[in-house]
């Protein structure tokens, strides 16, 4: 569509698509396409969308043994609107994802203990994320938290404190901290406010302005890669999936962010969510061409 509709306005779109989505699934697919050894845990309803989701997850090479089909629940959906400039809005209905409980986490503790990094996002109940984060901490692992959707930010303090790494975008950083990252200085201020809550590393994703890495020891701004933006839907998920893969390979923190940035940059050149995520070879080529 030329521009996102205003309240009360009806507009025409050039097309639509239906496919696998959800932040958890998108990040798992992104990591798998980049060569990561991924264990994806999720839930769908016993409906047509659930069957489609499982089929697509399998097509991306992910094991679906840990994807539950929930009786009496709809598969979660995200309604995404994309304007010609590539920006988007997303409305999420959790569906079967809301059926997870903290007690369900115990069955996955052996896998949690083996993981070098665990990706969490807020499209499942808060108490479930909290139980996973506690299990990761007990096992000496690392949590990378994507704090979207933020919702009531006051309820996130305990989860943020258990997350070694948090990677909000501009909007999420503002929602959580009250500081709008309009430039690098304000993005750093928001990141430092997040550091006060427990994480060791904050990575603020700044869209067309790149990303900002902030820890107790350093502040590093990473310039964006030069690409033609088509659709930004998969940018953050591809970034997180890329970071997780590089981190699990033992790359330096700076190289992790560069790898993640390249992954996100390639994703915005394509339409779609998980399907837009690049391969490791594509990321390597972009890193070679744009140092």
Residue ranges and their predicted role:
Residues 1-59, 228-230:
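Glycine-rich phosphate/adenosyl-contacting loop at the front of the ribokinase-like
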Residues 15, 41-46, 65-75, 146-148, ...:
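Beta-strand->loop->alpha-helix junctions that form or flank phosphate-binding loops
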Residues 31, 169, 236:
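Short, conserved phosphate/pyrophosphate- and ester-handling motifs at nucleotide-, phospho-/glycolipid
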Residues 32-33, 137, 248:
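Gly/Ala-rich phosphate-binding loop of Rossmann-like dinucleotide-binding domains
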Residues 61, 98-103, 145-151:
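Short gly/ser/thr-rich secondary-structure transition/capping motifs
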Residues 117-189, 208-211:
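Conserved beta-alpha-beta core of the PfkB/ribokinase-like small-molecule kinase fold
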């Amino acid at each position: 569509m030329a521009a996102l509709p205003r309240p009360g306005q009806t507009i025409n779109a050039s097309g639509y698509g239906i496919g696998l989505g959800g932040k958890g699934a998108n990040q798992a697919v992104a990591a798998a396409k980049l060569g990561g050894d991924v264990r994806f845990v999720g839930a769908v309803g016993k409906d047509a969308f659930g069957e489609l989701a499982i089929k697509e997850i399998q097509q991306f090479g992910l094991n679906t043994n840990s994807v539950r089909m929930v009786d009496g629940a709809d598969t979660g959906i995200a309604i995404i609107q994309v304007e010609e400039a590539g920006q988007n809005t997303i409305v999420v209905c959790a569906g079967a994802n809301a059926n997870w409980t903290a007690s369900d986490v115990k069955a996955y503790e052996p896998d949690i203990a083996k993981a070098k990094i665990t990706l969490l996002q807020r499209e499942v109940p808060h108490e479930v994320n909290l139980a996973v984060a506690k299990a990761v901490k007990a096992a000496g692992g690392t949590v990378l938290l994507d704090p979207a959707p933020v919702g009531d930010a006051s309820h996130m303090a305990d989860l943020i404190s258990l997350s070694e790494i948090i990677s909000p975008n501009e909007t999420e950083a503002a929602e959580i901290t009250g500081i709008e990252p309009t430039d690098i200085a304000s993005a750093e201020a928001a990141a430092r406010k997040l550091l006060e809550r427990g994480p060791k590393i904050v990575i603020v994703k700044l869209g067309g302005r790149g990303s900002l890495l902030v820890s107790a020891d350093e502040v590093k701004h990473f310039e964006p890669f030069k690409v033609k933006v088509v659709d930004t839907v998969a940018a953050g998920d591809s970034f997180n999936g890329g970071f997780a893969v590089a981190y699990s390979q033992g790359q330096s923190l700076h190289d992790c962010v560069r790898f993640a940035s390249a992954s996100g940059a390639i994703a915005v050149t394509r339409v779609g969510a998980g399907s837009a995520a690049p391969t490791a070879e594509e990321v390597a080529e972009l890193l070679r061409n744009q140092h």
